[in-house]
Amino acid sequence: KTFPELDPTQIPMAHPVKEEKVFYLLDPGGASRRSAGLKVVDKLARGLRWMLPYEEHAVELPYIPEFLKKEDGLLLSIGQFNQWVGNQLMGSGLVQIWPGTPVDSPLVEEGQVEGVRLVDQGTDRQGNPDTGYMPGMDIRAGLTVVGDGPIGPVGRQLDEEFGLPEGHHQREWAVGMKMVVDLPEDCALEPGTVIHTFGYPEPEIFGFMYVYPERVASLGIFVPSWMDSPVRTSYRYLQHWMMHPALWRYLEGGSMRSWGAKTLQESGMRGEPRLVGDGFARIGEGSGSTNVLTGSGVDEAWTTGVLLAEGVIELYKEGKPFTQKNLDKAYVRRRRQSWVEHEGHEAAQARDGFQRGFLSGLIGMGLTGLTRGVINLPGRSKPPHARVPSLETFYRGKISAQEIEELRARAAAEGTSVHDALMARVGWDEIPYDGKLLLSQQDALLVGGKVQAPPGYADHVVFLYPSLCENCDNKLCIEVCSGEAITSAEDGGVPEFDREKCVHCGACVWNCTQPREEGSERGNIEFRAGAGGLHSAEN
């Protein structure tokens, strides 16, 4: 609707959806953590494989529910799409875009947002003035539109300043990690193919693969906060997922083009912040627009921006200021009457069942989707730091507490994460690096398209209270870090941070197991504005 005369061929990598497949992936190696109920499901699937669409340790679902179908949709590289949109906007002469300009904070004066302040430049890593120091510029405006995503510093500061609406929370998260790859020449997948998976490498991890023209594919996994594991290593899990026989038959012989990761806000409408206030409005994923039933967020985020634009034009024509009252009428009312709101309400409780377990979650999603939100499976959410057990509890009966302590001490001495040793100990195979598609995490940083962090800026990942880190025996921030930018300190205290490796995914923020104060739902890690770390233009 925004581009009624759009020719998809103008956008690099765009292609209409042609075919959809959903696979339930069984564990081919026996290392996956599966409940008793899921083991029964797996046994039945293998026992009845002669009558099921079973192949390569996977069952293809014969029916895809309407709420999961992507037909009539368009496969896009968001990076390429954003560049294309940016060119359209700049070409209009009405908009300026300042890429690579980190915004430090909102300017809040007497309860009203007057604009934003850019980060200081010419500082040391602690933010102290250094050579070429220049304080951050203040940019003032009648209306500040905040669309900096779920872990953006401006949006999070507004949440702290004004609070979330009563009854709302932001407890469900996921880290999405993906690659763009060149498929092997003999790959049989056609452009427009959409593949979704669930069940492996751990039951809670969902996967996807989208095939673009010229044998290029985007593929990846989502690791959710309700996966109650202290070993949330997205990169290693991504490699195990790719090597599942049902997928490896398409990928073997391919090569990585680019790689990246980002945090997703999975609370849906219940994570909606205050959408407007005097001088500001919220749009996009950080405004609670993601549909947690269909797992879609791009169309919804885009539409929130369109709705705000319509409201702003209305107020401008009427000569009215951008007050909370006026924005409520012009924007929020439009949003409440939109398809985003309607479908978001239907989906609001879709994932509550996952609070009870994986199978309960699948049943709950099915009930919500098939009844359009009338029937839901209830579940009680918890803050992320209240969900994660200790390593000793998680591996009880498999690895002794003494051995875990030895592995932990060795990892601290080597400045590495402990997940590789733990996963090997419980039966996960080593990754057979091939230098093309299966790369070490550090090699992926080098060839995956990451933008390096320039000097002259303060570190953007900050451990607020050292004592909390020193008393933490489960440094999940190290295990989950997408770029291995957070590593163990020699003394086992405050982790070390190397911003050259940071991909700005924000996973450390919601994986911190130490609340910054009693009763707080926020951890001890603060994610501030910073330069560099962005993904390649196609990822």
Residue ranges and their predicted role:
Residues F354-I431:
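C-terminal auxiliary extensions adjacent to catalytic cores
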Residues S77-R249, L307:
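Predominantly flavin-linked oxidoreductase catalytic cores and closely associated redox partners
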Residues G220, D228-G254, R270-T304, A309-L315, ...:
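C-terminal catalytic lobe of FAD-dependent flavoproteins
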Residues K1-L52:
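N-terminal FAD cofactor-binding segment of flavoenzymes
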Residues M51-N82, N87, F222-P224:
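Helix-loop-beta segment of a Rossmann-like dinucleotide-binding subdomain
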Residues G288-T294, V306, E310-G361, E496-D498, ...:
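Active-site-proximal substrate-binding core of FAD-dependent oxidoreductases
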Residues A261-V292, A444-G456, S467-V480, T487:
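FAD-binding beta-loop-beta segment adjacent to the flavin cofactor pocket
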Residues C472-E500, A507-A537:
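Iron-sulfur cluster-binding cysteine motifs and their immediate structural context
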